[in-house]
Design a protein with these regions (language model features):
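Acidic, Ser/Thr/Pro
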Residues: 1-170
Length: 170
């Protein structure tokens, strides 16, 4: 149980970066070689929020993909900067995809994820914010992996305690 949970967490941690984008190069085209779930991540801020109509349109040969804002916005480090998973989408066919961001001014990105610090910070400018497209997994898979790692570690620890203290059985 512990090893399966840790395998899932390590896979999430080591997910591969597909492309780095800037808001200035709008729209951008990326060739995606593998099917699966991908995330659009905001680099430079521990907090990212859609204040209004900030949106992402992804098309492949004229077909629009469903892009959903993540409920649980995981944080990670990308080249020393804090990044936040913001959108996720599913790729079913390999090919060239066009990424177009709409209403970029409605994106609110701040350095700190703490509410008490965030109240006194200004919103980061678009020039200081970057975009990364990376592989990801679903939230439920991550939570199940985390729970399996914690429970597996606790069960293994309890087994070791009981193995070296046989008087606990009596």
């Amino acid at each position: 149980m512990f090893f399966f949970g840790m395998k899932t967490l390590i896979k999430k941690y080591r997910s591969r970066t597909i492309a780095e984008l800037n808001f200035t190069e709008n729209p951008s085209e990326i060739y995606i070689k593998k099917t699966g779930t991908y995330a659009v991540c905001i680099i430079g801020g521990g907090y990212a929020n859609n204040k209004g109509d900030f949106d992402l349109h992804i098309t492949n040969n004229g077909n629009k993909l469903d892009v959903l804002e993540k409920q649980m916005k995981f944080k990670f480090r990308h080249k020393g900067k804090l990044a936040t998973e913001f959108y996720h989408f599913e790729i079913k066919n390999m090919g060239k995809y066009k990424f177009e961001f709409k209403n970029i001014a409605d994106l609110e990105a701040k350095e700190s994820m703490l509410l008490s610090k965030r109240m006194f910070q200004n919103t980061l400018s678009v020039n200081n914010v970057g975009i990364v497209i990376k592989e990801t997994s679903s939230n439920t898979k991550f939570i199940i992996g985390l729970l399996m790692a914690v429970f597996g570690f606790n069960i293994a620890g309890l087994g070791i305690i009981l193995a070296f203290n046989p008087q606990l059985y009596m």
